[in-house]
Amino acid sequence: MSHGIVIIGSGFAARQLVKNIRKQDANVPLTLIAADSMDEYNKPDLSHVISQSQRADDLTRQTAGEFAEQFHLRLFPYTRVTDIDAAAHCVKAKDKQWHYDKLVLATGASAFVPLIEGHELMLTLNSQQEYKACETRLRDAQRVMIVGGGLIGTELAMDFCRAGKSVTLVDHAARILSALMPAEVSSRLQHRLTDMGVHQLLKSQLQSLTKTDTGIRATLDRNRSVEIDVVVAATGLRPETALARRAGAETHLGVKVDSYLQTTQPDIYALGDCAEINGQVLPFLQPIQISAMYLAKNLLGTSTPLKLPTMLVKVKTPELPLHLAGETQRQDLNWQITLETQGMVARGMDNDGQLRAFVVSEDRMKEAFALLKSLPV
């Protein structure tokens, strides 16, 4: 008897995999297990829920039941997997177990919360479920602190500001998006946030949070404090690797996979935000879509190594949107920047004059695909 394919997780990666498998095989048994409701929503929408006045339930695109019926699969929502027996090919929960021929870990990543005094007062916005738990507090808050000036923190800071809230953005780096691009490129967005009224406390360390009669007191280094109503942690994601480790699979930044997306354990694969591919975790939609296409083929019997093209990353800051690609974080590039009122084009060139990275903004974003073709494969 065939046990088929078992997938742990129900997010974008899991759904893309199901759709790609069903395009090729209508009959292989598919089982999905996840700790949440398994309803579908678009995770990037979380960066805009406040300015759009959306409730958590408004984000649902398709219910779990509709998904199961459409793609002919068994679903087990609100079910937390506790162990994986790789030798027996068995997944275990508190009162259930499932055997598998192939197992896919699509367990995602959780929001990292700095372990400072009062860290339990921080909110996270990494899932529909998390938003649902705090949407009333976020909607009612007037003074909002965002901890983290990376991709998500910057998007959230602009969104809360567009919703008319007083926003303080805190980061230990000297500038926003410091891990993504050089200062001369990110400064345009940084100035735009300042013009909008976002108070940026850069080169700053949040030390503690204390509940007060009127809200929360955030204490920072250099004897500074700020009174706010809510604090949102946007300090990065931590891939969920615990189940992989229990199965005996190797982990580092994420769950290590080879070019076929298989872990170090036979018949166990990883996909999405939890997977570490060539030493990198790629928590973006496009690499997950492409990886899901390759993994579906490999699970069904072909052996096709994953090939990821150079891909665009989109910074969803509507007042000054950005597209970027290539090795934007490289320290040795010479940046040629064209600034105009309608947008920016920044080209990162190596010592041989070869384009290695670019960032485009606003109306100049239409040039992104031509620049993408100029990047080395």
UniProtKB/Swiss-Prot annotation:
One of at least two accessory proteins for anaerobic nitric oxide (NO) reductase. Reduces the rubredoxin moiety of NO reductase. It comes from Enterobacter sp. (strain 638). HAMAP family: NorW (MF_01313). Its EC number is 1.18.1.-. This is Nitric oxide reductase FlRd-NAD(+) reductase. Its cofactor is FAD. Its main location: cytoplasm. It is an enzyme of class 1 (oxidoreductase). The gene is norW.
